[in-house]
């Protein structure tokens, strides 16, 4: 089965056939923010693609041939070429399909976007630590650390327009959005209390057709996380 909302393939499943000519395939998981990066770039660029969801708690044996680490996202083209790691997949798509560039051509502007991404890079591990934290006393420290990272991002928005890279969404917006989109479901939105520019940016992103097409239902996401943290093989298909 294929499609963003399709059930995932697990251990014992047959591997999918070759990628059709003129398409690209992405191995994904419905709730994964890293895979969401790749899916958003595919949509933003209008690239024909198919989605194969992988059960990350019950991985198919053949998937390790696509990525020995067993992680999503993975891109595969009709030539059998494989690309892994979310940021690398997005850069590959921007270069392999140059019709609608998401990174700016100007070297300095592109460097600025990459500097913002470097500043943002501490956010996903902090959110992951918060999700996995079993001790309530850890929560305030993690919240404070996350708030500080958001303040650093805010300080870098000196030439702020509607979006992080200018007047319209670009690569830096799509590479950061999945974690901001999950703040409400994780009850972390108050960490933005002292970053008004980031809050305005979030409001602008919610109006973007690509960003808004990836819905995160708070209750469903929390139930998924509960199952995922218990290593349940049912987690990745929760809600289907």
UniProtKB/Swiss-Prot annotation:
Cite the Pfam families for this sequence. Answer: GST_C, GST_N_2
Asked if the Swiss-Prot or TrEMBL record annotates the protein with the keyword Acetylation, the reply is yes
Which GO annotations describe the biological process of this protein?
A: cellular response to arsenic-containing substance; L-ascorbic acid metabolic process; negative regulation of release of sequestered calcium ion into cytosol; positive regulation of release of sequestered calcium ion into cytosol; positive regulation of skeletal muscle contraction by regulation of release of sequestered calcium ion; regulation of cardiac muscle contraction by regulation of the release of sequestered calcium ion; xenobiotic catabolic process
Residue positions annotated to bind glutathione are 59, 72, 85-86
User: Which keywords does the record carry?
Assistant: Acetylation, Cytoplasm, Oxidoreductase, Phosphoprotein, Transferase
The entry lists its GO molecular-function terms as:
glutathione dehydrogenase (ascorbate) activity; glutathione transferase activity; methylarsonate reductase activity; oxidoreductase activity
- Does Cytoplasm count among this protein's keywords? yes
Which transformation does this protein catalyse, written as a reaction? RX + glutathione = an S-substituted glutathione + a halide anion + H(+); L-dehydroascorbate + 2 glutathione = glutathione disulfide + L-ascorbate; methylarsonate + 2 glutathione + H(+) = methylarsonous acid + glutathione disulfide + H2O
Query: From which residue to which does any coiled coil extend?
Result: none
Q: Enumerate the CDD domains for this protein.
A: GST_C_Omega, GST_N_Omega
For the modification Phosphoserine, the affected residues are 129
Gene3D superfamilies for the chain: 1.20.1050.10, Glutaredoxin
Look up the EC number in the record and give it. 2.5.1.18, 1.8.5.1, 1.20.4.2
Q: List the subcellular locations.
A: Cytoplasm, Cytosol
Q: List every position bearing N-acetylserine.
A: 2
Residue ranges of every copy of the GST C-terminal domain listed in the record: 106-227
Source domain of life is: Eukaryota
Which residue intervals define the domain GST N-terminal in the entry? 22-101
Please list the residues that make up the active site. 32 (nucleophile)
User: What is the protein's known function?
Assistant: Exhibits glutathione-dependent thiol transferase and dehydroascorbate reductase activities. Has S-(phenacyl)glutathione reductase activity. Also has glutathione S-transferase activity. Participates in the biotransformation of inorganic arsenic and reduces monomethylarsonic acid (MMA) and dimethylarsonic acid.
Family to which the UniProt record says this protein belongs: Belongs to the GST superfamily. Omega family.
The record's subunit annotation is:
Homodimer.
| Designated name of the protein | Glutathione S-transferase omega-1
Species name = Mus musculus (Mouse)
């Amino acid at each position: 089965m294929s499609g963003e909302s399709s059930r995932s393939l697990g251990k014992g499943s047959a591997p999918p056939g070759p990628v059709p000519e003129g398409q690209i395939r992405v191995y994904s998981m419905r709730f994964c923010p890293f895979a969401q990066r790749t899916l958003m770039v595919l949509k933003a660029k209008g690239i024909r693609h198919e989605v194969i969801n992988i059960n990350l708690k019950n991985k198919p044996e053949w998937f390790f041939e696509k990525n020995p680490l067993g992680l999503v996202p993975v891109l595969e083209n009709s030539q059998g070429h494989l690309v892994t790691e979310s940021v690398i997949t997005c850069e590959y798509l921007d270069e392999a399909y140059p019709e609608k560039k998401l990174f700016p051509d100007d070297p300095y502007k592109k460097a600025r976007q990459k500097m913002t991404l470097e500043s943002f890079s501490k956010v996903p591990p902090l959110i992951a630590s918060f999700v996995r934290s079993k001790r309530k006393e850890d929560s305030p420290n993690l919240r404070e650390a996350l708030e500080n990272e958001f303040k650093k991002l805010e300080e870098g928005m000196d030439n702020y327009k509607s979006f992080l890279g200018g007047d319209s969404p670009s690569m830096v917006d799509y590479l950061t959005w999945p974690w901001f989109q999950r703040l409400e479901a994780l009850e972390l939105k108050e960490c933005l209390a002292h970053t008004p520019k980031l809050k305005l940016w979030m409001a602008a992103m919610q109006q973007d057709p690509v960003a808004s097409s990836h819905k995160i239902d708070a209750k469903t996401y929390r139930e998924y996380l509960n199952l995922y943290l218990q290593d349940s093989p049912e987690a990745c298909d929760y809600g289907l």
